[in-house]
Amino acid sequence: MFSIVVPVYNVEKYLHKCVKSILSQCYENFEVILVDDGSTDRSPEICDEFALSDSRCRVIHQPNKGLSGARNSGLNEANGIYILFIDSDDEIAPNLLNCLEINFNKYNVDIIGFNAVVNDIKGQCILSTGKNVGMVEDGIKIVQKRIPVSTVPLYCYKNEFLRKTNIIFKDGIYYEDVLFTAQIFMTNPKVFFLDETFYYYNKREESITTSKIKMKNYCDIVSICSELLDYEVVNDFAFENAYRNIIMSYIMLSEEIYRGMSMEDRKKGKINRRILMNNVKQRKSRVGILNYFVAEFPSLFYTVREIRRKIR
């Protein structure tokens, strides 16, 4: 059985489409855990309506704890063998669960990843996550190869595996799934990537990803980078290489966010930027010489990376 956790907060415009895409699965053995995170619109009533009309749906009503708190609440209540986290303004393809079960049985892995498309507010596709490779990989090797580690909704996890890691979503921050996914992959799970698109991100004007980047976004990604810098590094070449790649990718992410800020916020953020770069440089032996120079010249390395992307 699958447990599908859907954090819900003030999404009355989008919730019907999201849940209906789940209930329309051709595979029927699943539960939907709708976590109403203190919504102030009609979302709580909509959740209750789904629970009354379909026995596969159940609702958790809780005071607002943020996205991490909602996901953690759903995770605690999940009874399924497999767990998915679906954002309440997005949709999934009708054959997702069926395909996941077939491949979990075939490959006996801990995690299965899949592709997504991003639709704008008019429903037009503006981005695809690209092609995943249909093969089994170790989590450490995936990070070693610099294969992009996607956000939480693009993976299905074995419940037993997640319980053993004791990793949960960190409360009170943006980009909490960035930290969660990095921590999960550093436990070296067996991962299979499906080269198919099953997830549909729907951008909306008021969402975090489309609103003006604010100071808190940047401070949170700096906090995540700092937490990863304190991660215990095992004396193993593959692990060290993967760890350094993760540090590199999140330094670059912090630089990308920094560049998206207003000039006024950049001035405020310079202190945090300097603290992060100093933390990296102080851990030169752990993070490697390349990350040391990235911390010394973040703008230069970011520009080079963007040029290389365009050439490709």
Which residue stretches match the model-derived regions?
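Cell-envelope/extracellular polymer assembly enzymes that use nucleotide-activated donors
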Residues: 1-3, 21, 31, 179
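Short, well-formed alpha-helical segments that are part of the catalytic scaffolds
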Residues: 10-24
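A conserved acidic beta->alpha catalytic loop
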Residues: 21, 36-45, 63, 87
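Glycine-rich, basic loop-to-helix element that forms the pyrophosphate-binding segment
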Residues: 62-78
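Donor-binding/catalytic cores of nucleotide-activated saccharide
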Residues: 67-68, 88-192, 202-215, 233
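Short aromatic/hydrophobic "clamp" motif used to bind/position activated sugar donors
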Residues: 83
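Catalytic core of nucleotide-sugar-dependent glycosyltransferases
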Residues: 198-204, 211-237, 253-280
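Membrane-interface aromatic/basic loop that binds lipid-linked glycans or pyrophosphate carriers
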Residues: 259-312
